[in-house]
């Protein structure tokens, strides 16, 4: 979706898709070179999601089409820059098939990126991208106990998923850009800048605070982090709507932690 916003107006859908696919490959290449891993790279795209999530996605896509149409009619001008149907970014579509083929070919040669191995999991494989990554971590626990892992992604649930795996991989960090509206949330952050989120440090501070500022032992630290993740489910995630009385934008987290 970020790559779509970088492409100017167009008239030819086929040409647009080719430009988009090349842009995606180039952006992934840029991130690999920027982070500079020396062993493995895992590139994961969303495959078919669980049924509950599929229903949510379907509703969201229908709504976005109707909203765009209404917006154009109200303003009496074509304010939607691109008319390409973003529903094509769905497992099983012709576009995703083309993207999968290109990704597999483009990243076939790991030597080009100075790494030992590049693993690709495209939309042809079931499961959401982030879940594929963490499944790989769980299946290779010995390796991740002593290695540093950097995960790039914009989904908010990556923070919770990474916290949840700290007991398996104690040195995990999130790499992400800030969106253009970040100033409305935190004035200290700059839009479109790259940031590394130190998840081990976050987990350490979190477990200390939830343990009444008493240094937790290993079991307590693990349990406090799990408690925090569970409590945050009340604020909603990809699979659950937020609890009606709580909202993350209106001191929801502070309220929950105060009660805890």
Regions found by a protein language model. Give the residues of each.
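Noncatalytic, typically N-terminal accessory segments of nucleic acid-processing enzymes
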Residues: 1-260
């Amino acid at each position: 979706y970020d790559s779509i916003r970088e492409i100017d107006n167009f008239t030819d859908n086929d040409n647009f898709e080719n430009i988009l696919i090349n842009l995606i490959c180039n952006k992934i290449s840029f991130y690999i070179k920027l982070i500079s891993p020396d062993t493995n790279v895992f590139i994961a795209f969303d495959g078919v999601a669980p049924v509950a999530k599929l229903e949510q996605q379907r509703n969201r896509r229908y709504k976005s089409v109707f909203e765009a149409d209404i917006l154009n009619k109200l303003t009496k001008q074509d304010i939607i820059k691109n008319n390409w149907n973003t529903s094509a970014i769905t497992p099983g579509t012709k576009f995703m098939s083309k993207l999968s083929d290109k990704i597999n070919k483009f990243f076939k040669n790991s030597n080009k990126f100075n790494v030992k191995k590049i693993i690709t999991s495209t939309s042809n494989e079931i499961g959401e991208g982030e879940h594929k990554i963490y499944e790989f971590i769980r299946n290779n626990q010995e390796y991740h106990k002593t290695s540093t892992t950097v995960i790039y992604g914009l989904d908010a649930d990556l923070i919770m998923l990474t916290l949840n795996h700290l007991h398996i991989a104690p040195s995990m960090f999130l790499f992400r850009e800030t969106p253009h509206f970040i100033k409305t949330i935190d004035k200290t952050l700059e839009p479109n800048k790259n940031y590394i989120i130190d998840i081990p440090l976050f987990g350490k501070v979190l477990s200390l605070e939830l343990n009444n500022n008493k240094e937790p032992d290993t079991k307590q630290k693990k349990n406090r982090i799990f408690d925090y993740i569970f409590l945050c489910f009340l604020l909603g995630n990809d699979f659950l709507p937020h609890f009606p009385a709580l909202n993350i934008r209106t001191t929801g987290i502070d309220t929950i932690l105060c009660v805890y």
